[in-house]
Amino acid sequence: MATLHIEHPISDLPASLGAFSRFREARRRAVVRAERVLHPVDDDKYIYVSLDFDSVEQAEAFQNFLEANVWTSREASPALAGTPRARVLTDVDSASAP
């Protein structure tokens, strides 16, 4: 499994969540297995997104899609308030709490 971890400043949380929702079908086509959207408890102008994929290649392909089609468009990402930082991560160790 691979996770595409994204973080960036936003101008408005509801607008950011709305933009995220509009790309639900793109995430489905990219075979996103799980997704999480978070923001710091003390900063509603910053957002973190984690998207899980079956492979590193799928995660990298979706990152390329975001970089080429979403983050470059004000219409597609109206709440984006800075440069997104995205990295593909893989598990090296994990466990569930008892």
What are these regions (language model features)?
Residues 12-14, 55-57, 92:
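Residues that cap or initiate secondary-structure elements
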Residues 85-98:
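Short, low-order "capping/linker" segments at domain edges
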Residues 39-41:
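Short, low-complexity Ser/Thr-rich regulatory SLiMs
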